[in-house]
Amino acid sequence: MAATQYYGTGRRKTSTARVFAKVGSGNIIVNKRPLDVYFGRETARMVVRQPLELVEMTEKLDIYVTVKGGGITGQAGAIRHGITRALMELDESLRPTLRAAGFVTRDARQVERKKVGLRKARRRPQFSKR
């Protein structure tokens, strides 16, 4: 591995992303596939690109990602978090900008567990008065 490589771990819901960034031409590879192939949804692709567009490094860095667990939205959020951490490792002066956009904070929301006697986490069975 090259010495000019920057690493960041990102997490969201049940997804974990390992992000490696190095100086390049703007390629983003997710699980050995291009970003456009891996994510079918345009919104997921936008979420992944957000931190790079914010600091105007879309064409300056090559991003290589391995991501596990969760669904499309969770994985996209995890990759965004990982890219943000890699950018901060690259240049610490980017931290205030990324923090203001809300990319540095780990979104701690998790799925609430299903409770006994209920249909879902909070949905109760239908109540019949008579």
From Swiss-Prot:
GO molecular function, one term: RNA binding
InterPro entries listed in its UniProt record: Ribosomal_Su5_D2-typ_SF, Ribosomal_uS9, Ribosomal_uS9_bac/plastid, Ribosomal_uS9_CS, Ribsml_uS5_D2-typ_fold_subgr
GO cellular component, one term: cytosolic small ribosomal subunit
Domain of life: Bacteria
UniProt keyword annotations, A-Z: Ribonucleoprotein, Ribosomal protein
Signal peptide stretch: none
GO biological process, one term: translation
Family in the record: Belongs to the universal ribosomal protein uS9 family.
Protein name: Small ribosomal subunit protein uS9
Protein species of origin: Shewanella amazonensis (strain ATCC BAA-1098 / SB2B)
Lineage: Bacteria, Pseudomonadati, Pseudomonadota, Gammaproteobacteria, Alteromonadales
The gene coding this protein: rpsI
